[in-house]
Structures are given as C-alpha cells and as structure tokens.
Amino acid sequence: MMADVAALAAGAIRFASGVSFLVDPARADRWWGARKTPDATAQLLWRSMGYRDALIGGLLLAAALRGTNTRGWFLASGGADAADLLGGMAVHDQLPRSQQVVGLGGAVVGIGVGLWGATRRRRPAEKT
C-alpha cells in the first residue's frame, strides 16, 4: 500500500495547528496578527477552532495512514476553512491588514487544498 503523502501532510498540518490553538490560544492569536492578549471570548473561539482542526486533521491523517479514502476529510477541511472565510468576511473591514492577509488568505488557501484533495485522481496502489 502506497501512502497518500498529500493527505498525510495536510492532516498533519491541520492537526498540529489545532493542537497549538488548544495549548496556547494567546500565541495562536498573536501568530494570526493580533496585537494584544485575547480576552476570554477570543480564547474560547481559538480553542473551539483547535478542537475542530485537531479532529479533522487527525481523522485525515488516520485515513491516510490506513490507506482509506481521504476525500471526505479533505472536503471537511476545506469546509472548515470556508466557514472561517465567511465569518472573516463579515468583519473584514474591522481587521488589521495583517489579520486580513494571514487569516483570510490562509482560509482561501485551505479551501483550495480541501477542494483539490477531495477532487483529485489517485492512482490505484500497485500490487506487490
């Protein structure tokens, strides 16, 4: 069985990102461009995104390691980023430029990766 390297990479990145949001939401907030310590509501939202991303990333990673179909998990990953983009667009004019670029730009890239992963053709594994 040949490993799905793209699913391994995408799953590992989303899983690690989610865990980092859970472990240190203040650092995640700064990394995404915030200039001050996040309040309790922002920390709750970072942790909620962390649970979501760790779950989706972990399940994408697990499917890749098992050699099972990863399309649905790629689609879930892209859907999570689409929700982030939609929410971000509602406050786009209130975000500093750094958050517009990193947060919304990252969501656009994530949507693209999710759609690519869900629709790509995979060669059947060679029999040995």
Where are these regions (language model features)?
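Short amphipathic, positively biased membrane-proximal segments
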Residues: 1-128
